[in-house]
């Protein structure tokens, strides 16, 4: 069972050889699904076609690699002028709290400069985003297109 309490943020250690890449190179639906299951992110991992379409339609996909292994993904939609939305941030559990998520967020912020970066968090990730300087807002609504 997943702990739903807010966890205190702890300063991470760091991975020495972390490479950030932009784009879909090295990715496949199976590779993404494996990371998302392990992270865990609730996404359509059992529907490879839909999962791949999500990535192809994204404005920005950043991947983090360590020794040739995929250890993190950030996926963003943006209008390029006002808002960017961080759809996904997934980090391999074995390297969480080692600076991978922070490095991905730093790179997203560089590439989405001049826009407000919005995201949905969970109770577990709230401390991470607060530590990075994100502010919780109450005036947001979520609807689902049917």
Task: Give the positions of each predicted feature.
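Short amphipathic alpha-helix that is part of the acyltransferase structural core
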Residues: 2-48, 140
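Conserved catalytic-core motifs of GNAT/GCN5-like acyltransferases
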Residues: 3-8, 118-120, 130, 135-146
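A conserved beta-strand-loop-helix scaffold within acyl/acetyltransferase catalytic domains
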Residues: 50-89
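Hydrophobic adenine-recognition pocket in adenosine-nucleotide-binding enzymes
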Residues: 89-91, 125
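Conserved acetyl-CoA-binding loop-helix of GNAT-fold acetyltransferases
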Residues: 91, 97-110
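Conserved GNAT acetyl-CoA-binding A-motif
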Residues: 110-123
